[in-house]
Amino acid sequence: SLIVSSDLYKFTNTDFFNDHEYFYIYRPQHKLTYRIVSVYSYDDRHIMNSFDFDDDKVFQEYLDYIQNPRSFTKVVRDNSELTINDKIVTLSTCLNSGDGRLLLQGVLIKDELTK
């Protein structure tokens, strides 16, 4: 299903979040299936410029945060344990009020070859 940035807010509703466990990214000859781990509000820092993901300890700390974000707006899927071997993707949109971002985090669970 197609997710546009305005759709990300739907995932802050616990029922919607629980009813929509996966999203898909299509690449040439690949269908990538991601399990949604969490959605939460975050500040406006550029994540890739703010963390040294080459450092395994820093990356694991970030993954731990994804699973337990310090945010008033958050929904987290139970039984999601992320490790530095996981491949994650972040979908992001502006917050409706103030500075910051709404982030949806997914973990790759399947990479299917397509024709």
Q: Where do the language-model regions lie?
A:
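Extracytoplasmic/periplasmic soluble domains downstream of a signal peptide or transmembrane helix
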Residues: 1-115
